[in-house]
């Protein structure tokens, strides 16, 4: 059985081998691959290959395609999501969301399901090449996905000639992966409640799972769809892009290529600041032969990130209310997702739940592992 963690930024694929799960490596020996599809004059490209040409081919590169699955032109979050898109979504006469991209010399329109269909086909080709000759998959989705979004995902999987045996919530996949190898830590009758805080690229989910020795139950899930690492990166991009414009008179935010260079460097700055008090934001010849060079302290980073920190804190509080729990009901807190490595986010969780934090799960792989283990749980 193949388990697929379909993230907005990266995708990870696992396969059950005996009682364990192996992560299927890419052609470049990476454990995860970018969720990207690009079109050009000769071919479609995917993942790392699409990422390699993203700055020169941004207009034909579809980023965050999973966010558009099952949506139509009246989707209330459409305008918010547009600002993160490269190949801009358009609305057809019958209200469908389509991506317009130039492929082999002509412009074509693609539904999000079609884009994801060719992406799934690429994943399938990779695991078959690695010797896993199966079409049966379990795919995880955000818990907030409604029936029409899940159906759109199933339609995309069918395009790749795969058999989707189950679509499971990310909270279930994470809970399965967490609990399966910890059964001996729990009592047969008296449950222990674990809080999972998952802050990824585009969203934050907080959920509580009750564990006993032979069972688990997800109590509740609270999500903020626009509280992730990319939201922080965009705030910093606008701030430092504005400073650059003020100093040199040219605006890098009006150039998609410059914005991509800025975002790439800011993501590195964010990661460096998890272990350092300050670092440099340096980009040679960002625009009109002018260099960007600023020192960014962790304090300044946290001040600029304040709107997202506030949303994150509110999500933690709202999660307790929706679960009808008190901090004293929680036995442990498990941190999941790339953005929870940010020190201020960890501090906020400690303050909200009053517990030390555990980081035993691989942020990039735990959903894929849980998805693959789903049929054997």
Set out the residue ranges of the language-model regions.
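Oxyanion-binding/catalytic loops of NTP- or PPi-dependent enzymes
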Residues: 1-80, 88-92, 104-114, 118, ...
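Glycine-rich phosphate/pyrophosphate-binding loop
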Residues: 94-96
